[in-house]
């Protein structure tokens, strides 16, 4: 059985780990980094760049460089959070035919799972290069507060990337696994505060050890799937734009190129201010008007940054209070606090968390890598490589159906341990009703329309009867991935209807299969592109070495011998600029054939040079005089 890798598919950065023996190991990517920016770029020559190469060219290609796609995954275009992003993202967010939020690149609509799959493919390749074998299975993490649609979409991304997603696990739970695996015996309750690039989660987790087996049980979870480092960056960017407008009278919001430079500079300034008290944001030639070029140079202090984002940090504390209340615990009952996600490096965040819990958070957990490490541990558990670890996760939101009067009737309460199954009997609302519609909802509001609609289906063929008489049993079944299956059964006729909840929109199986085929076709195109680049490199090398030989020994060849070589060199040089690998290969062979005499002349010259060097060293030896010395002793 192959390895099951663990992938932290992050909003800003992603990370991959695997069990190496009995220890989890984070794998470095091709650039030598342990994390990979979750950035995808589509270039003008139809190349797809992922990670650092995509980030490097973002300034010159803002409309086709996609980032923070996780904020769109499994979301509707009309969602309030999506509309906020539409206003600030340099790329185009568009409405799909099914109402989902998609992205438009070069006139082509793309689904977020399709784009996220590019990052997953990079993670898969990173693991394969390290392991030296093909990887087909993975555990992928999601924010604990992701709803069913977002979990489904993440699974779809895995399928498109050619991975069988063995388990979807929650990020804070994964971090707890990473933290608790090597800790000593004893029971403890920990809080995982996970503030990443685009999402925030707080989970209360109990780690118990019974008979050598460690149980990680999630007691409660809460969060905000649209709060993270990107929002902190946007506050900095807006401040810089407003300051520049005050100084220069120019609004940079209409200039995508300038905004992309500002995004990069804003993120860099925010990171610097975690260790420094002040930084300069210096962007020469940010724009120009009739009076000439304009330069941006603004000082940003840590105090100013904290004032800009204070409400965001305060917003993160609300889910903390709710989770503690749901778990039935007081702050004093929390033994340890773990910080996860790059944004938790900000001193203000650490300070507020310490103030709330009355204790300093742990410093021995790497906030960027803990989630991927935990995912790898779970992969090891599923593969049978890691023993004596049991993970008990929860469903983050309540689940139920719409009943008479537009009310949501809850079947499964939030923070219920999964997998779980629950049934309840309902009846008809009208006399002689022959069908019922089961409308599945997720959320905490009593009003059905205020919750997330997960989908609906009909149960037909109910025998005519007075209202309230038929007995319809509705069963909710949540699997270990947090994916929901719902069935409805008429107890009178035995008729049953069941569905696995597909998001009320989401991708159909046909669309996913098409995207898998597209990804495979892209892999073939990538392979051909790599072969073309290798052929070009070989051609360039041959052109260079042939010209060098012509310069060194060309005078020893006749004009008739020299002309076809020069002609073949020029033809190969032209072919190397084209896209046809077959033609490049043919011209390489042609040059090798006509260069035979040049090669002979070059070898003769090399032999002559070697002979001259040998005779020179012999000649040098003739000047040596042999002499005998005798020891003269001092008298």
Swiss-Prot record:
NCBIfam families: PRK00290.1 (NF001413), PRK05183.1 (NF003520), prok_dnaK (TIGR02350). Induction: By stress conditions e.g. heat shock. It comes from Histophilus somni (strain 2336) (Haemophilus somnus). Belongs to the heat shock protein 70 family. Residues 600-617 have a biased composition (Low complexity). It comes from the Bacteria. Pfam families: HSP70. The modification Phosphothreonine is found at residue 199. This is Chaperone protein DnaK. InterPro entries: ATPase_NBD, Chaperone_DnaK, Heat_shock_70_CS, HSP70_C_sf, HSP70_peptide-bd_sf, Hsp_70_fam. Keywords: ATP-binding, Chaperone, Nucleotide-binding, Phosphoprotein, Stress response. Acts as a chaperone. Residues 600-635 are annotated as: Disordered. CDD domains: ASKHA_NBD_HSP70_DnaK-like (cd10234). GO terms for molecular function: ATP binding; ATP-dependent protein folding chaperone; unfolded protein binding.
